[in-house]
Amino acid sequence: ALAGAIIAGASLTFQILDKVLAELGQVSRKIAIGIDNESGGSWTAMNAYFRSGTTDVILPEFVPNQKALLYSGRKNRGPDTTGAVGALAYYMSNGNTLGVMFSVPFDYNLYSNWWDVKVYSGKRRADQAMYEDLYYSNPYRGDNGWHQKNLGYGLKMKGIMTSAGEAIMEIRISR
């Protein structure tokens, strides 16, 4: 299984994330997440929080510099009208927390794919408050386009999320 693995940062590609999606099987709402750590420091997993949906894998515990983590989420099994929506948190060796939000909704008549990244001061776990902070603070639409921003603390982000119900999200955190 690829999801839950750590790979060389340079090998994080859409093809790898397509394989992570395929591992999830026939699920109508799912996401493959790849986050490349080019920050110069190491990261330790805090937790993943799901507002809706779930995962079948454990968040990779330790992400050294120049390595990338692979993770996935999916809607609940069965005739459930949920998407794969949540946030994850990594404590960084610089003493701050990397928060990442993803939203692959069930109903595309009302919602779109959204994502965002933020660095929080100190140590913080992913929860409903982190999810809401990221979701309601000018997030990026999953529009098949690359986006970038300065995260503060000497870090920047470049990322992309696809618009499909079987979404791919790739993020690179660098100095």
Swiss-Prot record:
GO biological process, one term: monoatomic cation transport
This protein's record includes keyword Cell inner membrane: no
SUPFAM superfamilies registered for this protein in UniProt: Cytolysin/lectin (SSF63724)
GO molecular function: channel activity; toxin activity
Location of the region described as Plays an important role in the hemolytic activity in the Swiss-Prot/TrEMBL record: 1-10
N-terminal region: region residues: 9-28
Site (Interacts with the lipid membrane): 141
Pfam families, sorted: Anemone_cytotox (PF06369)
Location relative to the cell: Secreted; Nematocyst; Target cell membrane
Domain of life of the organism encoding this protein: Eukaryota
Main function: Pore-forming protein that forms cations-selective hydrophilic pores of around 1 nm and causes cardiac stimulation and cytolysis. Pore formation is a multi-step process that involves specific recognition of membrane sphingomyelin (but neither cholesterol nor phosphatidylcholine) using aromatic rich region and adjacent phosphocholine (POC) binding site, firm binding to the membrane (mainly driven by hydrophobic interactions) accompanied by the transfer of the N-terminal region to the lipid-water interface and finally pore formation after oligomerization of monomers.
Family per record: Belongs to the actinoporin family. Sea anemone subfamily.
Protein name listed in UniProt: DELTA-stichotoxin-Hcr4a
Source species of the chain: Radianthus crispa
